[in-house]
Amino acid sequence: MKKPLVGIIGNSYKIDNKYPAQGSGTINIEAIAEVSDALPVIIPSLPNYFTIAELLYSFDGFLFTGGRPNVHPSFYGEKATDAHGFFDIDRDQLVLPLIKACEKVGKPILGLCRGFQEFNVAFGGTLYPEIRDLPGRMNHRMPPEGTLEEQFALRHEVIINKNSIFEQIFGTNKVMVNSLHGQGIKKPGKRVIIDGYANDGTPEALSIKDSIGFCLAVQWHPEWNASSDKVSKPLFQNFGENLRLPSN
């Protein structure tokens, strides 16, 4: 049987700080291939080389990955400051209209970390540049030193709304997640439903009201240990199931 084709949004970087390149973390590819049981294809964040319509026609679903650059605040009506970090305008120009287009036609999409923030901005929401600077909030960034296992370790609890799609997927309304982000949702976008919060009030899971297809995003990185983690695995499995629906 033919497997669904999933476009994994790539990130810009430089090999040896010189040669421009596009890529994605191997764990994103493994999660799609092993848990969603789909064919992963990296889509370069170079919007001049293809149209949104071409992407919609070519792929069965999309994974909006994390990435170090932040969404440029001009896309949510604010000016850039030092606190906003650095940006990848090409990725912004690709993903923001792609998210809206996918949601409109019911194409399955899953957002992770930066992808979570992109979902919110795509629907008119805004972001805080640095969560840890807000009163009463904890530091959601990963430890600056340590192994990958230490940096991606489970860090805090997320309280999931009862009767939400996430509670249905996880089978519980309390989950433990990793945390590797600086920014976070300030104002939810139109139709954005916050389905889960960290104990300090930081939004951690979202869905889109009245969406006709799978349209979910989380602030953490479920791609880490996706084949074994009791939260990550059902999320990617459910994504894979939705990729195979006849309506897709």
Locate predicted features:
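Conserved G/P- and acidic residue-centered "switch" motifs that form tight phosphate/ATP-binding loops
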Residues: 113
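A short, structured beta-strand/loop element
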Residues: 212-214
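The feature captures the ABC ATPase H-loop/switch
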Residues: 116
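Active-site-proximal beta-strand elements of phosphoester/diester hydrolases
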Residues: 216-219
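N-terminal beta1-alpha1 cap of cysteine-dependent amidohydrolase-like domains
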Residues: 1-110, 121, 128, 132-170, ...
